[in-house]
Amino acid sequence: MNITVIGTGYVGLVTGVSLSEIGHHVTCIDIDAHKIDEMRKGISPIFEPGLEELMRKNTADGRLNFETSYEKGLAQADIIFIAVGTPQKSDGHANLEQITDAAKRIAKHVKRDTVVVTKSTVPVGTNDLINGLITEHLAEPVSISVASNPEFLREGSAIYDTFHGDRIVIGTADEKTANTLEELFRPFQIPIYQTDIRSAEMIKYASNAFLATKISFINEISNICEKVGADIEAVAYGMGQDKRIGSQFLKAGIGYGGSCFPKDTNALVQIAGNVEHDFELLKSVIKVNNNQQAMLVDKALNRLGGVTGKTIALLGLSFKPNTDDMREAPSIVIADRLAALDARIRAYDPIAVSHAKHVLPQAVEYKETIEEAVKGSDAVMILTDWADIKQFPLAAYQDLMETPLIFDGRNCYTLDEALAAGVEYYSVGRKAVVPSGAIQ
């Protein structure tokens, strides 16, 4: 089939590349000419393991093209995916300006009967809006069918998830449209669930809200564990053995971030409010997450008595490992607070520094290695559990710091490892490791 994907952000590019990999001819449209030029050269605008390699392969094979022109990009499309951003407004609602713009451009340039599929995460009822806009502005006498197909990818493993996902959700009441999309997705060999459009829209929000709830729940349990002398790692493992609960998303830390959970939880609170339902549970999930991000700084302040003039090394900046995404990363909240307290901040991340420079305080000093960031610092804060950070030997902190003091927001080390290394170590939901003679 001939597929057009509007938007080459995280969702759009992964969608386009993956569909070309299973044999479809795909054109990705973006109005950013520089971005399109870079992708034509085989340079991905985002870091995602395996994405750039597949992009280059399918471009070379002639199945994947990049275009700035809607007229050219939509001319032969059998199916059009809308994968533009729906950023959060200041009041928590989703901003649908890019969605409505895409719908109007489709109406103006589409030349044949086409299925329009919304891949972007949109509030319930948005596909009705899209259908209305296209119908109102349609320039040619063609038939358009609108469907919902929410994405469930995890940044850092999006390519794997595309080919090994749990389900593909299709929202449409039209049998012909459903059959067309099932044929499109069949090569993925992933179970397909068809439902109505509004339920498909809600499935995405409900799924992300539930996962965010698990994260905030385990973080609240971790805070209690610290006070009663329990170990959150043991508690989470024991909980996860119950198949009704499952072990995923029971990793205590400094909270969630990224492009989905913060935006989607806030949007769902607004969706509920629009129908006069006070979503108290989800409001608490958001509040817990915001508090959790500040927790590590509180621990440092309690231990050091203040951070003014102190050198603090931040290890890991992206919101999670294996991505360069800085959106809503806990490192932003932590760096902002440290800067406001006049701390000297050094930072290391293997991938995300170029993006971090746009959102972290100007005073942050970036280092190319863990050693450079840690050497001579008064304290270290581990914010992202990148593999190289997790594998960095605790004993090395002894050589690099006069008084090794580590605040681990991702529980990268065991307590036994910290004890054996002789470092002062504070983690999440576990007792502190304090060597004899350490000043507290």
Curated annotation (Swiss-Prot):
<protein>
    <recommendedName>
        <fullName>UDP-glucose 6-dehydrogenase YwqF</fullName>
        <ecNumber>1.1.1.22</ecNumber>
    </recommendedName>
</protein>
<dbReference type="GO" id="GO:0051287">
    <property type="term" value="F:NAD binding"/>
</dbReference>
<keyword id="KW-0597">Phosphoprotein</keyword>
<dbReference type="GO" id="GO:0005737">
    <property type="term" value="C:cytoplasm"/>
</dbReference>
<dbReference type="GO" id="GO:0000271">
    <property type="term" value="P:polysaccharide biosynthetic process"/>
</dbReference>
<feature type="binding site">
    <location>
        <position position="204"/>
    </location>
    <ligand>
        <name>substrate</name>
    </ligand>
</feature>
<feature type="binding site">
    <location>
        <position position="121"/>
    </location>
    <ligand>
        <name>NAD(+)</name>
    </ligand>
</feature>
<dbReference type="InterPro" id="IPR017476">
    <property type="entry name" value="UDP-Glc/GDP-Man"/>
</dbReference>
<feature type="binding site">
    <location>
        <position position="35"/>
    </location>
    <ligand>
        <name>NAD(+)</name>
    </ligand>
</feature>
<feature type="binding site">
    <location>
        <position position="155"/>
    </location>
    <ligand>
        <name>NAD(+)</name>
    </ligand>
</feature>
<feature type="binding site">
    <location>
        <position position="30"/>
    </location>
    <ligand>
        <name>NAD(+)</name>
    </ligand>
</feature>
<dbReference type="GO" id="GO:0071555">
    <property type="term" value="P:cell wall organization"/>
</dbReference>
<feature type="binding site">
    <location>
        <begin position="151"/>
        <end position="155"/>
    </location>
    <ligand>
        <name>substrate</name>
    </ligand>
</feature>
<feature type="binding site">
    <location>
        <position position="208"/>
    </location>
    <ligand>
        <name>substrate</name>
    </ligand>
</feature>
<dbReference type="InterPro" id="IPR028357">
    <property type="entry name" value="UDPglc_DH_bac"/>
</dbReference>
<keyword id="KW-0963">Cytoplasm</keyword>
<comment type="similarity">
    <text>Belongs to the UDP-glucose/GDP-mannose dehydrogenase family.</text>
</comment>
<dbReference type="InterPro" id="IPR014026">
    <property type="entry name" value="UDP-Glc/GDP-Man_DH_dimer"/>
</dbReference>
<comment type="function">
    <text>Catalyzes the conversion of UDP-glucose into UDP-glucuronate, one of the precursors of teichuronic acid.</text>
</comment>
<feature type="binding site">
    <location>
        <begin position="249"/>
        <end position="253"/>
    </location>
    <ligand>
        <name>substrate</name>
    </ligand>
</feature>
<dbReference type="InterPro" id="IPR001732">
    <property type="entry name" value="UDP-Glc/GDP-Man_DH_N"/>
</dbReference>
<dbReference type="InterPro" id="IPR014027">
    <property type="entry name" value="UDP-Glc/GDP-Man_DH_C"/>
</dbReference>
<dbReference type="InterPro" id="IPR036291">
    <property type="entry name" value="NAD(P)-bd_dom_sf"/>
</dbReference>
<feature type="binding site">
    <location>
        <begin position="2"/>
        <end position="19"/>
    </location>
    <ligand>
        <name>NAD(+)</name>
    </ligand>
</feature>
<dbReference type="Pfam" id="PF00984">
    <property type="entry name" value="UDPG_MGDP_dh"/>
</dbReference>
<keyword id="KW-0520">NAD</keyword>
<feature type="binding site">
    <location>
        <position position="327"/>
    </location>
    <ligand>
        <name>NAD(+)</name>
    </ligand>
</feature>
<keyword id="KW-0560">Oxidoreductase</keyword>
<dbReference type="GO" id="GO:0006065">
    <property type="term" value="P:UDP-glucuronate biosynthetic process"/>
</dbReference>
<feature type="binding site">
    <location>
        <position position="263"/>
    </location>
    <ligand>
        <name>NAD(+)</name>
    </ligand>
</feature>
<feature type="active site" description="Nucleophile">
    <location>
        <position position="260"/>
    </location>
</feature>
<dbReference type="InterPro" id="IPR008927">
    <property type="entry name" value="6-PGluconate_DH-like_C_sf"/>
</dbReference>
<feature type="binding site">
    <location>
        <position position="11"/>
    </location>
    <ligand>
        <name>NAD(+)</name>
    </ligand>
</feature>
<feature type="binding site">
    <location>
        <position position="320"/>
    </location>
    <ligand>
        <name>substrate</name>
    </ligand>
</feature>
<dbReference type="Pfam" id="PF03721">
    <property type="entry name" value="UDPG_MGDP_dh_N"/>
</dbReference>
<dbReference type="GO" id="GO:0003979">
    <property type="term" value="F:UDP-glucose 6-dehydrogenase activity"/>
</dbReference>
<dbReference type="Pfam" id="PF03720">
    <property type="entry name" value="UDPG_MGDP_dh_C"/>
</dbReference>
<dbReference type="InterPro" id="IPR036220">
    <property type="entry name" value="UDP-Glc/GDP-Man_DH_C_sf"/>
</dbReference>
<keyword id="KW-0961">Cell wall biogenesis/degradation</keyword>
<comment type="pathway">
    <text>Nucleotide-sugar biosynthesis; UDP-alpha-D-glucuronate biosynthesis; UDP-alpha-D-glucuronate from UDP-alpha-D-glucose: step 1/1.</text>
</comment>
<feature type="binding site">
    <location>
        <position position="257"/>
    </location>
    <ligand>
        <name>substrate</name>
    </ligand>
</feature>
